[in-house]
Amino acid sequence: VKVKILGAGPDRQRLEELARQENAPVEFLGYQDHGSMAAWLRASDITVNSLVKSAVQSIVTKIGDYLASGKPMVNTGSSPEFRNKVTTDGFGLNVVAENPEALADVLEELARNPSLRKIMGARGRAVAEREFDQRTSYLAIVNLLRNLI
């Protein structure tokens, strides 16, 4: 298993040091432009929507990119709305944020089951095309706002 972490956050230095100390197979890639990020996601076997418990997001914008990759998603977000979507639409698995043992168990389960990864990835891609396509979703938002004015 190799872990690639895209983006940066306030804990990056601490996490890089921890990965070095543990000799963990983790590579911190930092900020990636959209094209590079999409390429990394497509090259992955599993994507992880990693959020801390205190995150207030409901459905973050990166979700559409994760789903479009056609890979299964492990979600650590706590939004009941999105956790239900993950389960109902069947494109991934939910894990409680900040529970590394549970995260490792779910990643191992997916790593050992390529057919499940393929099924979940295809479901995620279908959700992305149906609900996260900016050409149609942005137009729907504009129309909604026009109707409110």
Q: Which residues fall in each region the model found?
A:
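Short alpha-helical segment that forms part of, or immediately flanks, the ligand-binding pocket
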Residues: A38, V60-K71, F82-N84
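A short, well-ordered alpha-helix in the C-terminal region of glycosyltransferases
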Residues: Q21, A102, E109, L116-E131, ...
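Conserved acidic donor-binding loop of glycosyltransferase catalytic domains
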Residues: N49-L51, V74-S78, V95-V96
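Nucleotide-activated donor-binding/catalytic signature segment of Leloir-type glycosyltransferases, i.e.
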Residues: K4, Q13-A38
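Acidic donor-binding loop of glycosyltransferase active sites
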Residues: L41-S58, K71
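Active-site donor-sugar recognition loop in glycosyltransferases
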Residues: S36, S54-S58, G77-E81
